[in-house]
Swiss-Prot record:
Organism ancestry: Bacteria, Pseudomonadati, Pseudomonadota, Betaproteobacteria, Burkholderiales
Record GO terms (molecular function): flavin adenine dinucleotide binding; glutathione-disulfide reductase (NADPH) activity; NADP binding
PROSITE patterns, per database record: PYRIDINE_REDOX_1 (PS00076)
More info: The active site is a redox-active disulfide bond.
Purpose of the protein: Catalyzes the reduction of glutathione disulfide (GSSG) to reduced glutathione (GSH). Constitutes the major mechanism to maintain a high GSH:GSSG ratio in the cytosol.
Keyword Nucleotide-binding included in the entry's annotation: no
Cofactor binding description: Binds 1 FAD per subunit.
Subunit record text: Homodimer.
Protein name per Swiss-Prot or TrEMBL: Glutathione reductase
Subcellular location: Cytoplasm
Reaction(s) this enzyme catalyzes, per UniProt: 2 glutathione + NADP(+) = glutathione disulfide + NADPH + H(+)
Amino acid sequence: MQKYDFDLFVIGAGSGGVRAARIAAGHGAKVAIAEEYRFGGTCVIRGCVPKKLLMYASQYGQGFEDAAGFGWHSAATSHSWTSLIAAKDAEIARLEGVYQRLIENANVEIFKGRAQIAGPNRVTVTGASVSARTILIATGARPVMPPVAGANLMITSDDVFDLPVGPPRIAIIGGGYIACEFAGIFNGLGRHVVQLHRGSQVLRGFDDELREHLGDELKKSGIDLRLGVDVVAVERQRGALSVQLTTGDAMEVDAVMAATGRLPNTWGLGLETVDVGLDQNGAIKVDEYSRTSSPGIYAVGDVTNRLNLTPVAIHEGHAFADTVFGGKALPTEHENVPFAVFSQPQAASVGLSEAQARDRYSNVEIYGSAFRPMRAALSGRDEKALVKLVVNGSNDRVVGAHIVGADAAEIIQGIAVAIKARATKADFDATLGVHPTLAEEFVTLRNRR
């Protein structure tokens, strides 16, 4: 039997790669991992974690405003962008250390540098050439710039976390979750925000009613959301940026952020040397066990463009390690995965949208409610929450749940368990609610639309 330097070589130390390395090592495999940037990947370094820290920071302004309705009187407040970024940096450095220690404690050998596949079972990194029985690619994805003049003047979500100054006026291009989240962050921090989206509504792929409701709430929060419009060009003028629109209008801002999509990080990995198949967007094609078209090479996470969420990458990495090194054939599961958008207000979904359910089932029942949350009763804020259940009328099973409102992300996690367990509408009806809460609406919905 041929001998290799490692049983597994992982390229990329993000959430999926680190989980795969640790689990494989726990099964007794000799494992190495290579990372050219920082441990933790997109989620820890320039994604989910720092974004949510900024989201928390941005909510205090609204809290100060709402406090007056509850009898509080406070002096004028101000915000320090530099203090926020410094605190964020310290926390991210701490988490990066946690990730690296997890790898070290699992006795995984670490290579600092860019790894490339040099041929079957062969990887080069930092001048070294090593052999591995199995190679796992977990290199994630990167933001892409729109193909317009002046794109070099734009920033992306990667750049936002390191801005030396928070821009007073910012235009955000896009209608996906990243665009909506950063629009809420900058708006909450007191910046003037214009969100530009060429589509008819934000959050393509989500339930249509949720999309429309969130769009209305974003506008009411103070975001200048413009739909059906795109950017033609960006120019620097008198120390600011001039943004030319397809409507013929122009606006002046201090920063333009592109949040128009992400592409898999497959360039320069040497995939052509081993005939790893890619799709039209450059994502690595894999089967349900994360196997590529090349024997002995696997891929997990955003680089496969299956479902680009951190818990999904972790699940895929864990399933891969158990399958290849743990003797358990575990296909990856992508059904009923909950989604959360940390916009302001938050939006969250699990299961099928109403349109998807009607395409799949002949008998679909819809239950929903839009209402003013209790907090707004005294604050006077003009806002409405939305809850919605999608039910397969043939067997009463709840196949989709959607929510817009405070703590939607926390609420949908519990609802996801119920849907995963194939709960019926009768099960929801028989469950007592916690009163007074937004979440209780899911178990008190009675009127079918």
